[in-house]
């Protein structure tokens, strides 16, 4: 039994390292202007987003909608509406909630600076009970002046923000993706807090 302890320790370490593979990198500018700020505005953009194996989001939506409608009339139409409405209803609130908790910056429309979270890649993942693939997002992040959004203060990238739920009961695409946005918000908030 003693010889099994190192094995389990190694297994636990490798699992914890594997689940925290998200990378955030400051690619331009300086975050020090946020040092005296207590709030920040957030905006989200989804233009020119790649989805899974598709170079254009529109192609993915058409393919998925047709596939679901073939299985059950109207199901694809319902899914397509949720694909867009989940952004305001689920993804953005989850991001903001976890970002606030980990950054100590309150989200406010009248803040001096705005964080623009531009999702550039989405892997919706899947869960069909016997096998699954986690959701994942990549994004470009810009910190700009709220009054003059052409004035970019800093740019960063977020890679591999993972969406999954404890227990694996994330059969809904929106649920998996909302967890990816929560993961991104938490990690980005901590990243900014650590830089200040």
Predicted regions, residues:
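Ser/Thr- (and often Asn-) enriched beta-sheet segments in non-cytosolic proteins
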Residues: 39-43, 114-116, 138, 157
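Short secondary-structure boundary motifs at beta->alpha junctions and helix caps
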Residues: 70-84, 150-194
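Surface-exposed short loop/turn segments
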Residues: 24-26, 102-152, 163-171
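Generic short beta-strand segments
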Residues: 44-49, 119-124, 157-159
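A structural "domain/chain start" motif
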Residues: 21-89, 93, 190-196
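A structural motif corresponding to the C-terminal end of an alpha-helix
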Residues: 91-106
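Bacterial Sec-dependent N-terminal signal peptides
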Residues: 1-26
């Amino acid at each position: 039994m003693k010889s099994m302890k190192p094995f389990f320790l190694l297994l636990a370490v490798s699992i914890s390292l594997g689940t925290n593979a998200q990378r955030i990198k400051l690619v331009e500018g300086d975050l020090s202007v946020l040092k005296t700020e207590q709030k920040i505005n957030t905006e989200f953009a989804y233009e020119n987003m790649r989805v899974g194996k598709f170079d254009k989001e529109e192609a993915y939506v058409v393919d998925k909608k047709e596939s679901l409608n073939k299985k059950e009339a109207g199901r694809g139409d319902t899914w397509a509406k949720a694909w867009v409405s989940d952004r305001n209803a689920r993804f953005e609130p989850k991001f903001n909630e976890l970002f606030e908790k980990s950054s100590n910056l309150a989200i406010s429309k009248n803040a001096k600076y705005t964080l623009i979270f531009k999702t550039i890649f989405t892997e919706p993942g899947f869960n069909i009970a016997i096998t699954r693939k986690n959701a994942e997002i990549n994004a470009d992040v810009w910190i700009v002046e709220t009054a003059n959004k052409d004035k970019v203060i800093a740019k960063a990238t977020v890679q591999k923000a993972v969406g999954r739920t404890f227990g694996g009961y994330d059969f809904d695409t929106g649920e998996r993706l909302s967890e990816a946005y929560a993961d991104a918000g938490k990690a980005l908030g901590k990243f900014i807090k650590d830089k200040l």
